[in-house]
């Protein structure tokens, strides 16, 4: 029997009685050095500082008939390596079971005294991640960080996109004696250093609530610059059939009303608002900021002269 165990922050005391018994009865125990260091002195199993499935499977093959326990940080079901081992174990017909642990999101939630069921959960640890798009679409976003993506680097990306005022909470070394909670705006946190074991919660309280195509005309900042009216915008977005990752052009963007709606409809894409009139360009900037349309890029110039240098579009509004 191979038992896959979520060890939370790495404390033996945090394991369930079932998980502790599985470790004590195992002949082999696998895990990162940090997790193996949390085992009690009376744990007599042979310990292997291995966590890659191929390495574990090879060692199991060299020790047939022995029960094993494999330790994972956090919870086995939350961006864990457990699934990467469980699949080949089942394919090989090796009996396996899973005991979950306490994830970092639960630890941060408990430290803050707040529920987490409404948070969007995103991994920036070894995964492609667009923090700007996530925070454009969700009021509260929890980032699991690691590797090259730290709380500071994610907050810097938000700041560069114009979301520096978003509220941030960083939890360091959660569930340990060194646990620290830090608060600040994204701009403030971008310039700080954090422990390797850190997570980030970003809350964008100014997230616009308008989502259905065709925002009311009065919701935009206006002047004498012409603006595409609500009914036309709604019909245009329906006809363009915008996808979340699209690259879009709005040529002759005016107040930026169409550009803003395109940007919010394609949060993981880019919208290029082409406009040559200075007054209109200023309105586009203001509406971009009002709606947090961080993926809206203003191109100041006259079409078609400025179009040659833009990425090829998936759809164009003129």
Go through each PLM region and give its residues.
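Class I S-adenosyl-L-methionine
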Residues: 1-102, 106, 268-271, 275-278, ...
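A contiguous loop/helix-start segment that scaffolds small-molecule binding in enzyme catalytic cores
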Residues: 2-6, 50, 65-68, 138-225
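Short SAM/SAH-binding signature in class I
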Residues: 67-69, 140, 312-318
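Conserved hydrophobic residues forming the short capping helix/wall of the S-adenosyl-L-methionine
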Residues: 89, 158, 288
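Short, glycine-/small-residue-rich phosphate/pyrophosphate-handling segment
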Residues: 104-139, 146, 150
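Conserved alpha-helix/loop element of class I SAM-dependent methyltransferases that forms part
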Residues: 229-244
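Conserved class I S-adenosyl-L-methionine
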Residues: 245-254
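Conserved SAM-binding loop of SAM-dependent methyltransferases across substrates and taxa
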Residues: 255-267
């Amino acid at each position: 029997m191979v038992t896959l165990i979520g060890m939370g922050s790495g404390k033996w005391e945090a394991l369930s009685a079932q998980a502790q018994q599985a470790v004590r009865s195992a002949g082999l125990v696998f895990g990162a050095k940090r997790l193996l260091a949390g085992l009690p002195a009376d744990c007599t199993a042979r310990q292997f500082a291995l966590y890659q499935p191929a390495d574990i499977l090879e060692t199991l093959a060299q020790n047939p008939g022995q029960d094993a326990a494999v330790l994972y940080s956090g919870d086995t079901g939350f961006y864990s390596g457990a699934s990467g081992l469980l699949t080949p174990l089942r394919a090989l017909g090796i009996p396996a079971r899973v005991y979950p642990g306490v994830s970092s999101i639960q630890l941060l939630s408990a430290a803050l005294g707040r529920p987490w069921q409404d948070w969007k959960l995103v991994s920036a640890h070894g995964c492609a991640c667009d923090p700007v798009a996530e925070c454009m679409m969700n009021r509260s976003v929890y980032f699991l960080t690691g590797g090259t993506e730290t709380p500071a680097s994610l907050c810097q990306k938000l700041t560069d996109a114009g979301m520096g005022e978003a509220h941030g909470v960083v939890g360091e070394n959660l569930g340990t004696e060194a646990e620290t909670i830090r608060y600040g705006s994204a701009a403030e946190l971008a310039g700080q250093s954090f422990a390797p074991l850190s997570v980030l919660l970003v809350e964008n309280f100014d997230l616009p609530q308008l989502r259905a195509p065709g925002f009311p005309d009065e919701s935009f900042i206006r002047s004498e610059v012409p603006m595409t009216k609500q009914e036309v915008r709604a019909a245009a977005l329906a006809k363009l059939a915008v996808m979340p990752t699209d690259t879009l052009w709005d040529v002759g963007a005016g107040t930026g009303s169409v550009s803003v709606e395109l940007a919010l409809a394609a949060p993981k894409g880019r919208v290029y608002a082409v406009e040559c009139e200075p007054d209109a360009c200023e309105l586009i900037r203001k509406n971009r900021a009002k709606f947090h349309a961080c993926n809206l890029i203003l191109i100041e110039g006259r079409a078609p002269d400025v179009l040659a240098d833009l990425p090829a579009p998936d759809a164009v509004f003129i």
